[in-house]
């Protein structure tokens, strides 16, 4: 049974790629057709690769892997944070700070500073400090939480990194590759897939598409850690047991949506 049905992918708009003039030719094999100047992703391949990504993430989690979710654009930020937290993992959903992985020692010092400021507030230190100094500390904490809050409790460099839009997150992907960290990613038609270990061909610009894929990978982590029974199965999910919609039906939907 496919972990994501063709129907779910269609409803979330996962099939819409970028304008044809913005494509990366290396994504050609994942593209089904072109309609009205927009590339249409082959969802039969997305179904297959989503299954592979699910299995990869589940198996990694079963071996106690630390997973870092990365998605800093506005369409991804909320889903990345919510699903990372739901699956007990870590996230970066604002600007990626260069050296987050390759200069982990320095990042740990900044995280330690964040924790120190929090302790100062909790133990009453703020109450005896001048208001001006407290204001500066709060400003520093807010900034540190914005960029590092999602990895504040990450015990080590991640074993796996999941990325929404590796075209935008090129620095993060390069750091992961330098350290030998496998990358699972939603890859749109404008992206070079060469540095991605586990590819999910998908529209990475639609909020619903990002939420669907990201939530399913979070489910994989939960299953890997807690077993299949821990994953909540949606009522319509059983429909994915049936034969996937045909390519012709996909074209009809796409033509209708782009009319």
UniProtKB/Swiss-Prot annotation:
Transmembrane segments: none annotated. Disulfide bonds: none annotated. One of its GO terms (cellular component) is cytosolic small ribosomal subunit. Keywords: Ribonucleoprotein, Ribosomal protein. GO terms for molecular function: structural constituent of ribosome. InterPro entries: Ribosomal_uS2, Ribosomal_uS2_bac/mit/plastid, Ribosomal_uS2_CS, Ribosomal_uS2_flav_dom_sf. The keyword Zinc-finger does not apply. One of its GO terms (biological process) is translation. Belongs to the universal ribosomal protein uS2 family. HAMAP family: Ribosomal_uS2_B (MF_00291_B). This is Small ribosomal subunit protein uS2. It comes from Streptococcus pneumoniae (strain CGSP14). The gene is rpsB.
């Amino acid at each position: 049974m496919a972990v994501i049905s063709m129907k779910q992918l269609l409803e979330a708009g996962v099939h819409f790629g970028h304008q044809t003039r913005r494509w990366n030719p290396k994504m050609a094999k994942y593209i089904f057709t072109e309609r009205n100047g927009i590339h249409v992703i082959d969802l039969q391949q997305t179904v297959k690769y989503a299954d592979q990504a699910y299995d990869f993430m589940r198996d990694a989690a079963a071996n106690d892997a630390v997973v870092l979710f990365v998605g800093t654009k506005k369409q991804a930020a909320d889903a990345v944070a919510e699903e990372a937290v739901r699956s007990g993992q870590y996230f970066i959903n604002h600007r990626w700070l260069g050296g987050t992985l390759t200069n982990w020692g320095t990042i740990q010092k900044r995280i330690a500073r964040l924790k120190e400021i929090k302790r100062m507030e909790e133990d009453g230190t703020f109450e005896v400090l001048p208001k001006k100094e407290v204001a500066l500390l709060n400003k520093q904490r807010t900034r540190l939480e914005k960029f590092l809050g999602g990895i504040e409790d990450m015990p080590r460099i991640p074993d796996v990194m999941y990325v929404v839009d590796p075209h935008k997150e090129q620095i993060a992907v390069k750091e992961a590759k330098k350290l030998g960290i496998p990358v699972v990613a939603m890859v749109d038609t404008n992206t070079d897939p060469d540095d991605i270990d586990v590819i999910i061909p998908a529209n990475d610009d639609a909020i619903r598409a990002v939420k669907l894929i990201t939530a399913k990978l979070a489910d994989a982590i939960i299953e890997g850690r807690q077993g299949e029974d821990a994953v909540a199965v949606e009522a319509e999910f059983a429909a994915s047991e049936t034969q996937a919609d045909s390519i012709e039906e996909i074209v009809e939907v796409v033509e209708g949506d782009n009319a």
